[in-house]
Amino acid sequence: MKIGVVAYQGSFEEHALSVKRVFDKIGKGEVIPVKRAKDLDVDGIIIPGGESTTIGQVALRLGLLDPLKEKISQGIPVLGTCAGAIMLSKEVTDAKVGKKSQPLIGVMDASVIRNYYGRQRESFEATVDLEEIEGGKERFVFIRAPAISKVWGKARALATLNDVIVMAQEDQILTTTFHPELSGTTSIHEYFLRMVKR
């Protein structure tokens, strides 16, 4: 199994370490950085947190955005965390400025509000119930986190925090508004790798 992590900025190294920890449990696998379309020969893709506008602009400039969208549309499993969730959603607004124009992959039937909880100083940790993916309650890190304000079509909420969607899935697309790679647990990565294995 080969997992690619989009590696422009953000917590891509932490995602790679989390995936390697899961590989240590379930068997062999490889994690590679994805920066260009030629790097997309993988079984699953992770789009990490960071700054969604920057990630989108760099991916567009380096010719990754359209091939990535095509690969996801063809069914490759993808995990988007925080900024990655923003990139994958069809609708994006900003908590302060409203409608946001930025390069998106836009493949998931979801609407996301950027900076829902405020800016950097409003970052926090919270306990999220992972019952929908057969997990328990775990603490996760939220950094300038977005909120998934609604899902439709085949998309469904997997976890909420104070009635706000923080994790959702549509077929092979999984998104979280929190940072599982910074939270000391591999439960989200384990679930994602089970999706890839199917």
UniProtKB/Swiss-Prot annotation:
<dbReference type="GO" id="GO:0042823">
    <property type="term" value="P:pyridoxal phosphate biosynthetic process"/>
</dbReference>
<feature type="active site" description="Charge relay system">
    <location>
        <position position="179"/>
    </location>
</feature>
<feature type="binding site">
    <location>
        <begin position="50"/>
        <end position="52"/>
    </location>
    <ligand>
        <name>L-glutamine</name>
    </ligand>
</feature>
<feature type="binding site">
    <location>
        <begin position="143"/>
        <end position="144"/>
    </location>
    <ligand>
        <name>L-glutamine</name>
    </ligand>
</feature>
<keyword id="KW-0378">Hydrolase</keyword>
<dbReference type="InterPro" id="IPR029062">
    <property type="entry name" value="Class_I_gatase-like"/>
</dbReference>
<dbReference type="GO" id="GO:0004359">
    <property type="term" value="F:glutaminase activity"/>
</dbReference>
<dbReference type="InterPro" id="IPR002161">
    <property type="entry name" value="PdxT/SNO"/>
</dbReference>
<comment type="function">
    <text>Catalyzes the hydrolysis of glutamine to glutamate and ammonia as part of the biosynthesis of pyridoxal 5'-phosphate. The resulting ammonia molecule is channeled to the active site of PdxS.</text>
</comment>
<keyword id="KW-0315">Glutamine amidotransferase</keyword>
<dbReference type="GO" id="GO:0006543">
    <property type="term" value="P:glutamine catabolic process"/>
</dbReference>
<protein>
    <recommendedName>
        <fullName>Pyridoxal 5'-phosphate synthase subunit PdxT</fullName>
        <ecNumber>4.3.3.6</ecNumber>
        <ecNumber>3.5.1.2</ecNumber>
    </recommendedName>
</protein>
<comment type="subunit">
    <text>In the presence of PdxS, forms a dodecamer of heterodimers. Only shows activity in the heterodimer.</text>
</comment>
<feature type="active site" description="Nucleophile">
    <location>
        <position position="82"/>
    </location>
</feature>
<dbReference type="Pfam" id="PF01174">
    <property type="entry name" value="SNO"/>
</dbReference>
<dbReference type="InterPro" id="IPR021196">
    <property type="entry name" value="PdxT/SNO_CS"/>
</dbReference>
<keyword id="KW-0456">Lyase</keyword>
<feature type="binding site">
    <location>
        <position position="114"/>
    </location>
    <ligand>
        <name>L-glutamine</name>
    </ligand>
</feature>
<dbReference type="GO" id="GO:0005829">
    <property type="term" value="C:cytosol"/>
</dbReference>
<dbReference type="GO" id="GO:0008614">
    <property type="term" value="P:pyridoxine metabolic process"/>
</dbReference>
<keyword id="KW-0663">Pyridoxal phosphate</keyword>
<dbReference type="GO" id="GO:0036381">
    <property type="term" value="F:pyridoxal 5'-phosphate synthase (glutamine hydrolysing) activity"/>
</dbReference>
<comment type="pathway">
    <text>Cofactor biosynthesis; pyridoxal 5'-phosphate biosynthesis.</text>
</comment>
<comment type="similarity">
    <text>Belongs to the glutaminase PdxT/SNO family.</text>
</comment>
<feature type="active site" description="Charge relay system">
    <location>
        <position position="181"/>
    </location>
</feature>
<dbReference type="GO" id="GO:1903600">
    <property type="term" value="C:glutaminase complex"/>
</dbReference>
